Every structure is written in C-alpha cells, then in structure tokens.
C-alpha cells in the first residue's frame, strides 16, 4: 500500500500507464489522452481550489506502526484527497473510451485511493470525496470532448440491391495514390472480386470520367459501381452511382476513410460479405451547385459530396487537426488547430439567409452532425434528408477569443459568434469568389453556392452484423 501511494505522487503512476496506453493507436491512445486531461482537471481542482477553501486536519499518523506511515507526510489540507481524485479521474476517463481498459485500470485506482487511508494521511471521507470529484470531472469532459464508442451511423436497411457473387456485374475504380503509396489495392480487389471490372485510376484524368467510361464499355451487364480509396475517391465514384442510379460499393484504402467508417465498412472483407449477400443501406448524397461568375460561361456546375463541404478557413483547420490528431486525439487537436487558424485567418463576407455578414468559416455537413452546438464530429444517421450548416461569425468584437473560450468551456452553441441551421437546402453568396472544399479537397471557386440533398439516396452495400455473428470486426484507428 505504501508503495502504491508513493508511486502515485504527482500522478507519476498514471502518466506511466498513459504512456503504455498511448503506444497503441485507436481507443487505447484516446483513453490515455482523455485520462491525462482528466488528471489535470481533477488534480488542479482538488489541490489548488478545494484544499485552500476547505482546510481540514489530517489524521494522527503517529498512532500507526512506523513501517506503515510515510517518511515525509503531506502538510496540506486533508480534504479532499488529491491522489483519490486523480486515480478516479484517470480510471473513469479510460473506461469512457474503452470499458475493457477501464476494467483493468480500476483495481489499481482503487488501491491508490485506499492506500491514502492505509498510510494515515487521509480520512476515509477525504478519499470518497476525492474519488467522487475525479470521476465527476472525467464524466464532465463529455460536454466538450464527446465519446463515440462505435463508428457506423444508423441507416435504413435495403433489400433491393442485387447479389454480386465474386463481384459479377461490379465496376470498381482503385486509386493507388490514396493511403499507402507502396501498396496497390487493385490487386486485392481483383482477388476478392474475380468477376468484377477493376479500373486503375490514372492521375492525369478525372476519376469519375474514368469510371463512367468503364461503365459504358461494360454496358448492360453493370449492376453496381464502387471505389477503393480515400474520401475524395469515394465521393467521385459515388457521384457516378447517383447519376446512373446504381448501388455503390466502398472499400476503405485511404488515410482516414471518414465515409467508410460512418457507413460501417471497415475493410475489403466486409464489402465482399455485403455484396455476396445483397445487404445495403440508404445514404444521402449531398449536392452543391456552383453558380457561374460574371466572366464565365452561364452554366451551373453540380458537384457531389458525401461528408462535408466548407468555405473560408475551415479546410485549413481540418488539415491541421488531422495532422495532429494521431498524437493528441481529435478534440485537443481541434482546439489547437482552431487557435492557430483563427490567429491568421481572414474573414469572408457572405450573404446568409438574405443578410450580409462576415464569417471565419462556413461548414456544411451531409446530414446533422453531433454534437450540436460544438465541433462537428460524427453523424448519427445517414439518411436524414437534411444538411447541417454551421458558421463562425467575424463581425462581432473579439469573436476569435470568444469562440476559443466558448469551445473550451463547452458553450460554443450558446455563443453569439456561432450560427447553425439544419435545412434541406442552403444558399450562400460571397462578396469575392472563394474556394470551396468538399470531402477534404479544394475543388471549385465561385461567388455563389447552393447546397441541397439529392432527391434519392444512394444504395451502399453494408453487411448486417446480425447475419455475420461469426465474423470478427476490424477497427480503424
């Protein structure tokens, strides 16, 4: 007990455990990051705030055997126990991200908490109160750092898609430039779908044009189209599926694979299972109409996107967040990226709902994102028929400072600098033509954009897990 108590001094024990957890990507690393932030909140609250405000005499350790007591006992207030607060905060935070890891850490946290009574430096009520404080602060972190234990969103199951055994009737495009440049996913596709037509994307031509040509050549035998690549590749191929009213197959081989994770297709095997069984879900396809400028041809161009579109500095914000996310986690990375981007960003004058205003950025999600009033993180549903539009105003004094402060306190949705709408169609006009980014790629420049949801969702193959209970599910970190 004495050893456990000393090891937890200054939270060194928990930092060591966090280091071990952070060595693995995925939920383990996220658990470590949340645990460290929870310790910071619990320790500072207990030691810097509550102890000075609530002084309490420590127990008389002289009544205990010398081998049981500490050589250098603390002299600060006994209430509450900072060790118990940090232990409970760390264990609770870890359990929020990974219940399995939380179960492993909990006995160690309980040992540290009890050890403070055992060595005679705290009353039992100090430890109980400290543990409650730590657990409460860890749970409170969900207000600005939400927990998502599953990747895939809800979507309406469909029984109308054809069965594609061995990929018969499937035309797929494979983008080797997505993900690992040393690996060509086309070889894997040809092995998994021996009867499919696999097109290796050429970098000097538009990907959707290459897929369209392959579909034309295959003729009436085509029953579905698909793509292997990242979000940009998948979005381009999904546009072909939408135009031709064909079911869609997605195989995640990119770096982040946001759409595949939302749909719930984690690897090639899941796509093979779904196509062989004819299992699919309905997914909204978002459209953006790019209006012509005064000096261009009077033709409205329409682009498709599956995840998000953005104007202003939002693409830079996402780029920084994704670069830092593997080391820090999504929410700390987003907060840091927001500070950096807002510091050097230039406001954009836009007309929203008939009124001109200045914004730092404008975000459009294909479907409502959660959490509301905060940083958009995930979609609970894929077929809502709505767009999630958010913007950060720049026409209010100290808007950047207020936005960062509101984000840190989990109150962005209540701030005057923040705007949000959930609509089926949204029109925005810019005073000066600005660049549009869709699904992480800058694609157009115009002075006016109209966003809407396509009248019909696309059919995306996704296996029904209740029919595949014998399959292990992979996890994309």
Placement of each model-derived feature along the sequence:
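Terminal transmembrane helix and immediately flanking juxtamembrane interfaces
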Residues: 1-42, 124-167
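Hydrophobic alpha-helical bundle signature of multipass membrane enzymes
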Residues: 1-76, 85-112
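Membrane-embedded catalytic cores of phosphoryl/pyrophosphoryl-handling enzymes
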Residues: 68-161
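Short, conserved phosphate/pyrophosphate- and ester-handling motifs at nucleotide-, phospho-/glycolipid
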Residues: 83, 126, 231, 252, ...
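ATP/NTP phosphate-donor binding region
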Residues: 150-225, 235, 239, 477
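Catalytic core of DAGKc-family lipid kinases
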Residues: 177, 183, 242-247, 253-360
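Gly/Ser/Thr-rich active-site loops/lids in small-molecule metabolic enzymes
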Residues: 325-332, 375-399
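ATP/nucleoside-binding phosphotransfer catalytic cores, i.e., glycine-rich phosphate-binding loops
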Residues: 354-356, 381, 391-477
């Amino acid at each position: 007990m004495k050893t456990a108590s000393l090891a937890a001094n200054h939270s060194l024990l928990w930092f060591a455990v966090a280091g071990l957890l952070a060595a693995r990507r995925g939920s383990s690393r996220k658990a470590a990051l949340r645990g460290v932030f929870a310790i910071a909140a619990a320790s500072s609250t207990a030691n810097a705030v509550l102890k000075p405000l609530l002084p309490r005499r420590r127990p008389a350790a002289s009544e205990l055997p010398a081998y049981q007591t500490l050589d250098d006992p603390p002299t600060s207030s006994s209430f509450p126990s900072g060790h118990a607060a940090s232990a409970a905060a760390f264990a609770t935070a870890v359990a929020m991200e990974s219940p399995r890891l939380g179960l492993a850490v909990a006995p160690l946290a309980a040992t540290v908490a009890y050890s403070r009574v055992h060595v005679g430096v705290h009353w039992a009520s100090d430890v109980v109160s400290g543990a409650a404080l730590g657990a409460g602060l860890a749970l409170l972190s969900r207000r600005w750092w939400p927990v998502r234990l599953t990747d895939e969103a809800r979507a309406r199951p469909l029984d109308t898609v054809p069965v594609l055994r061995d990929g018969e009737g499937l035309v797929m495009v494979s983008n080797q430039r997505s993900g690992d440049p040393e690996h060509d996913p086309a070889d894997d596709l040809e092995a998994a779908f021996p009867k499919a037509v696999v097109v290796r994307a050429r970098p000097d031509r538009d990907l959707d044009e290459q897929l369209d040509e392959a579909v034309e050549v295959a003729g009436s035998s085509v029953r579905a189209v698909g793509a292997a690549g990242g979000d940009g590749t998948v979005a381009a191929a999904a546009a072909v599926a939408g135009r031709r009213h064909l079911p869609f197959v997605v195989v995640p081989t990119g770096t982040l694979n946001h759409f595949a994770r939302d749909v719930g297709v984690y690897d090639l095997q899941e796509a093979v299972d779904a196509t062989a069984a004819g299992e699919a879900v309905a997914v909204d396809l978002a459209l953006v109409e790019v209006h012509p400028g005064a000096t261009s041809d009077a033709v409205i161009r329409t682009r498709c996107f599956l995840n998000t579109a953005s104007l202003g500095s939002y693409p830079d914000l996402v780029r920084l967040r994704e670069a830092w996310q593997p080391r820090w986690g999504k929410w700390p990375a987003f907060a840091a990226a927001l500070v950096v981007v807002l510091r050097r960003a230039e406001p954009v004058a836009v007309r929203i709902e008939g009124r001109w205003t200045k914004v730092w950025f404008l975000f459009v999600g294909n479907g409502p994102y959660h959490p509301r009033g905060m940083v958009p993180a995930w979609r609970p549903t894929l077929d809502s028929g709505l767009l999630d539009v958010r913007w950060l105003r720049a026409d209010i004094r100290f808007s950047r400072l207020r936005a960062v402060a509101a984000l840190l306190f989990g109150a962005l949705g209540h701030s005057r600098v923040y705007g949000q709408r959930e609509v089926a169609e949204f029109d925005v006009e810019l005073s000066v033509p600005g660049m549009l980014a869709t699904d992480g790629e800058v694609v157009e420049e115009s002075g006016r954009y109209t966003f809407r949801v396509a009248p019909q969702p696309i059919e995306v193959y996704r296996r029904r897990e209740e029919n595949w209970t014998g399959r292990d599910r992979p996890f994309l970190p």
